[in-house]
Amino acid sequence: MKEKIQLELKAIFQDIHSVLDRYLIPNAQDSESKILYMKLKADFFRYHCEFAEGKEFEEASDNARKIYKECFELAEKILPLYNEVRLGLALNYSVFEYDIMDNKNDAFDMASKIYGDIMKILDDVEKKRASDNLLLIQLIKENINIWSNETDED
């Protein structure tokens, strides 16, 4: 039963990647949309990593990391720090590094940096825009707290 579900998930992920690669990413109307679609693609590779093993895990994790890294670098250049897509990307990328790749220090540093940067500019940010994204900011902060406690225990 487990294998059947995993096969079905892989087929769904392939379909999603196909739609993203064929239609959404190449036809994105702006850079923010392109980053969002790339993030989704990386997210689905991350989901695949949750049950993949061996070579399949290596391929899925390599693809996820490559795409997360590419869109994270692009987002840093063109999206404001408080942008919902950029914050969601930072959250998901850091979770990938922490949970999937077991790069706890890198994940902690990434989350801490973005949280620290957003706290520095929060007063300057248009209040409405910032409040729309407070949940993402709070999730990043919660991960920092959890990861900090886990690191202290090690």
Located regions from the model:
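Amphipathic alpha-helical repeat scaffolds of TPR domains
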Residues: 3, 10, 14-17, 32-53, ...
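A contiguous pocket-lining binding segment that forms or flanks enzyme active sites
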Residues: 56-81, 85-99
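Short coil/linker segments at helix-helix boundaries
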Residues: 1-11, 15-26, 46-70
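Acidic, serine/threonine/proline-rich low-complexity intrinsically disordered regions
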Residues: 51-64, 99-110, 153-154
